[in-house]
Amino acid sequence: MNDSIKEKSMLWIEDVYKIYGNKVVLDDIDLAVSAGELVTVVGPSGCGKSTLLRLILGQEFPTRGSMLLDGKPIGFADPTRGIVYQRYSLFRHRTVLGNVLEGPRLSLPFMERRRRKKELLDEAKHFLEKVNLASDLDKYPHELSGGMRQRVAIAQSLIMKPKILLMDEPFGALDPSTRQSMQLFLLELWEDLGMTIFFVTHDLHEAVFLGTRIIVLSHQYLDDRGEYGHVERGAKIIADHPLSVTAKSVDAKKTAEFGELIEEVRLEIDIRHKKHVKDFNLKHPLSWRTLREEEHRLTGATKYDS
């Protein structure tokens, strides 16, 4: 079963651990993501959401385990993975257009930049048009609203043509009205470009509204390793839900179905409702995981596949 899932996957994560000293942050993470998915990731504060994102980006490497992008091991950060943070990654003294061109300027050899000057300029303008900033090319960051700055940051990533766009709480610093408009903008952009997006957020409403799939990461769970508190446990994927991919509008947040899903995810994060590893809510068709024998004691088994 795992081989067939692996063949369908753009991003493949298997038996991944991240340990700092004696602290286990990520504990045997298994994840498969296919091209074109918009995956949202939620979980309690400090559970390792941003750590997982840094591993995919290549800023850090797993202590153990395998991570593949299009079948190749993930190495140091490169243009195959774009990143947008909560803090705007803009150069203050460059225009909007100059900021978007900065990535190619820093990554390409001088002669290639010179040869492709018009092509790169056209590409920068194209992506700024995609993020609705075609009329703001000559403005500087201090002249832009928070939402506009984040759209510039997204265009900075897009011009590098990443296979996957990673977003770490990108709308967290925006006011509620701007945040909502940016959510709608991101959905339009995702549908237009067919991008693969991995979106980390602490906001359950945002995660359910945006995602085609929502993953819950948590270190609050039960297994067969003894009493909690006596065994160092890191975070696992405790839930993996497929979400509706029908046309979304702000009105979708007002439906009973939306509210029920929010409540279901909220209960999964709530430490008062810990689940045993064998009962994790892994509903997505690409969900899979392996467990060590000490986590779930099955006679004669060293791994448990589901």
Say what each PLM segment does:
Residues 42-44:
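The feature captures the beta-strand-to-loop junction immediately N-terminal to the Walker
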Residues 57:
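Helix-to-loop junction immediately C-terminal to a conserved catalytic motif
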Residues 61, 101-118, 130:
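ABC-type ATPase nucleotide-binding domains, specifically the catalytic core motifs of the NBD
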Residues 65-76:
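Conserved ABC transporter NBD signature motif
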Residues 115-136, 188:
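Conserved ABC ATPase "signature" region
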Residues 140-144, 148:
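Conserved ABC ATPase signature
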Residues 159-163:
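A short, proline-enriched helix->beta-strand linker immediately N-terminal to the Walker B motif
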